[in-house]
């Protein structure tokens, strides 16, 4: 197996890996693939190298060699439930940040190829069959943007078991308040309801479908990175105090 084979095999198994490339020095051009725990998966060990506690892209020098460390993970997979106009914009935004995207709707006419980028997987399916037909725990984020509250409710019951995976629900504050009240009446715990993101998105004053999509994807990124989505300028002022 070559380095590409090793990486693809790891990605296919949802196993992260780390590539260390020697940029200069005696082993210039060499690539070594490690597991997150430092086990060698491909190549010859770099003497003295140990896996850093925080794994992120970085340059480092060791044994008179300059090296570059690059973590490799399978692209996040997003499931979008509902195929309306906002859904199309949301799909495009998630593709833009490197996610895989699957869109599900029970209306076949809303899943035409011309409505979505060719990289989007389109599935015609009754929302009541989500749990039976899809591996829901393989998604890192689920976005519920159906056409009516009753379909939102069906979707939420279908994905309930994957919490605390990111699950966002689009709707007005009034619609979301009512929907979450009904969920509690149907047996959802406060902890489960509080793990849902609704109304979905960061408050950036979004109005158009494109802006709403930006708001939704921004919230997803903030949640995944354990951030609150505040202004960076505000953070600067806090640091100066």
Give the ranges of each region predicted by the language model.
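Short amphipathic alpha-helix with an adjacent loop that forms part of the alpha/beta core around
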Residues: 128-138
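Adenosine-phosphate binding glycine-rich loop
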Residues: 170-241
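ADP-ribose/adenylate-binding Rossmann-like module
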Residues: 104, 141, 146, 157-182
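A short acidic, amphipathic alpha-helical/loop segment
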Residues: 93, 154-158
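Short beta-strand segments
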Residues: 21-23, 81, 105, 145-146, ...
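Segments forming oxygen-rich coordination pockets for charged ligands
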Residues: 1-106, 110, 114-119, 137-140, ...
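Conserved SAM-binding strand-loop segment of SAM-dependent methyltransferases
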Residues: 120-126
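Short, well-ordered alpha-helical microsegments
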Residues: 87-88, 131, 151-153, 176
């Amino acid at each position: 197996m070559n380095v590409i084979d090793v990486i693809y095999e790891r990605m296919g198994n949802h196993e992260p890996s780390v590539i260390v490339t020697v940029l200069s020095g005696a082993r210039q051009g060499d690539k070594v693939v490690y597991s997150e725990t430092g086990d060698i998966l491909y190549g010859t060990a770099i003497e003295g190298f140990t896996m850093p506690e925080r794994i992120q892209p970085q340059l480092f020098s060791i044994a008179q060699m300059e090296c570059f460390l690059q973590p490799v993970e399978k692209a996040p997979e997003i499931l979008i439930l509902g195929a309306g106009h906002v859904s199309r914009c949301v799909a495009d935004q998630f593709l833009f940040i490197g996610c895989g995207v699957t869109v599900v709707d029970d209306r076949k006419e809303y899943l035409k190829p011309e409505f979505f980028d060719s990289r989007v997987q389109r599935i015609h399916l009754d929302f009541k069959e989500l749990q039976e037909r899809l591996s829901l725990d393989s998604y890192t984020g689920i976005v519920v943007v159906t056409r009516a509250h009753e379909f939102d409710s069906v979707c939420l019951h279908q994905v309930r078991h994957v919490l605390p995976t990111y699950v966002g629900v689009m709707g007005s504050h009034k619609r979301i308040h009512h929907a979450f009240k009904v969920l509690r009446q149907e047996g959802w715990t406060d902890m489960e309801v509080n793990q849902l993101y609704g109304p979905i998105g960061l408050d950036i004053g979004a109005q158009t479908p494109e802006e709403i999509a930006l708001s939704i994807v921004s919230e997803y990124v903030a949640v995944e990175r354990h951030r609150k989505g505040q202004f960076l300028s505000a953070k600067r002022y806090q640091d100066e105090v």
